[in-house]
Amino acid sequence: MLFKFLRLVFRLMFRLTVEGDIKQFNHPKCLITPNHVSFLDGVLLTLFLPVKPVFAVYSNIANRGFMKLVSRYVEIVPLDPINPMAVRILVKEIEKGRPIVVFPEGRITVTGSLMKIYDGAAFIAAISEAVVVPVRFEGLERTLFSRLKGIFKLHLFPKVTMKILPATQLLMPNASSSEQRRRLAGERLHEIMMNARMATRPQETIFESLLVARKQFGRFKPCIEDVSFKEDSYNSLLKKVLAASRILQRFTCQGERIGFLLPNATIMVAAIFGASLRGRIPALLNYTTDSHGLKNALAVASIKTIVTSRQFLKKERLTHLSEQVTEVNWVYLEDLESTVTLLDKLWILWHLFFPKQAMVAQKPDDDALVLFTSGSDAVSKGVVHSHASLLANVEQIKTITDFNPLDRFMSSLPLFHAFGLTVGLFTPLLSGSRIFLYPNPLHYRVVPELVYECNCTVLLGTSSFLENYAYSAHPYDFARLRCVIAGIEKLAENTKQIWQDKFGIRILEGYGMTECAPVIALNVPMMAKVGTVGRILPAMEFRLIPIAGIKQGGRLQLRGPNMMKGYLRMEDPNHLEPPAVKDEHGNIQFDWLDTGDIVSIDEQGFCTILGRGKRFAKQGELDGGKADFVTLCKIAEAE
């Protein structure tokens, strides 16, 4: 009777719903592995699981006084990670047909992301040959019973969902020692837990994701600032997004690709989201290219309108572009300010309270954005990403990192590059972190000063940029930095060394390409290995195609939710060419992408770039190739 009453209370207070197949818990050998986000996790499992499980509780918690009261209602077995006898007890319970609940993290998260995973839970599953059933709680981390006070905005009774994921078999790894088998099993369980998060990610558009962030982190939470030094909250950013959408719809059609030739600034961000919410497709143009390159991009994506700023063109000495490229309609921001009417202002005010009403009907798999890459053949191609692929890469990054509302990003890499766009804009904006947008990464003295002045905790850059920042910066300029990510070119040893010696900071390397939105692999503090570009991101499949004459490694092919919809090529701009590859038998397979890179992947999943294929891929790359780095360097020419 008590349990029935408590179930009713929780359903009413937290609007709790249970999703997934509960029949999985009837498996004769079952290990249940929930994420651990609050003190209520165990209570809800006790109340809403269709079975009566045994709870394996780490001994430092199980021996506390209040657990004696809890043990009256649920069966508890203390689990000591370093005591093999405790593991044997749980294995025997599983063999008796008793379902076991183990929190693999061993403690409540203090970051909002997965904490480290203890090997004990994985070893129990591997020894007993039990199926692993991941359970994810969403919403409990926003309650007062979490440990995220001061980091996230907490609510008294947020909406809570308990999601049950498909059962997975965790086999005993092949290794020479029990210690290695235990470690590899733990890494496999970590992978299962990360994939569980990816499997339960919301399916939405990029504008809907902005609204979710606004609700989660607070409408008046500061989120973005540029060189005007006027910081916008989520609410004031939404106001600018609505204004941009209202204006853009006057001279564009739904489904049309709009070219944006703008620097890193809040207005650029507002234009991207504003175009998207009204069903337009932003095409982010490279303003460092010449008129010929710009014409190619316009032709490839069938762009009829370019939105830019006279002030920007004049400052960067780009006025010749509008004079030489005459086949499109040039729209200037300065001309649009005077066109806003009273009716427009009332429309914006209304939709500031009801923003979803401003959206046109869209699906997550619809075209969301066009980026451009020249690849190895130096011919411009349009890379079309959907809402789902962009947000999948954001979720992959959030799954392996712990970015939170206390962080502040220095985003100086151009937004027309996938690295700058996804890692420098979408990820922090949707994580509640603040962003400072700076238009030129080659201002080697200014960027470190701004990092210091703005108390930035995350910095993105290339090896060359980071090296020059290190030489120009005062030793205390980077005192608040806790994460430095290098991409686009190989991270040089001397760059690593000067950052370690002068600032005591380890630079994290990654690997990616525009077609993957862009991150494919990334070293993070929890999972890092020197000489590699990190592990392949969760929810991505990979395979190595053997290459004649190469004994170690192979050509990397990928498939995952962050993959582009396809290419736009000059030969047929109206045709979207889906990704396709030849497998090792020479058969064509769609939905796979050939990176052209020769890599090796060790037993722990760490990826090492061995050679360069047609894409000029290199170690530490996070977007495109050699041509992208050259493009970035051209930014300085206008200064």
Curated annotation (Swiss-Prot):
Active site residues according to the UniProt entry: H36
Cited InterPro entries: Aas, AMP-dep_synth/lig_dom, ANL_N_sf, Plipid/glycerol_acylTrfase
Keywords associated with the record: Acyltransferase, ATP-binding, Cell inner membrane, Cell membrane, Ligase, Membrane, Multifunctional enzyme, Nucleotide-binding, Transferase, Transmembrane, Transmembrane helix
Gene name linked to the record: aas
Protein name: Bifunctional protein Aas
Transmembrane segments: 258-277, 409-433
Domain of life: Bacteria
Pfam families found in the cross-reference section: Acyltransferase, AMP-binding
Single GO cellular component term: plasma membrane
EC number in record: 2.3.1.40, 6.2.1.20
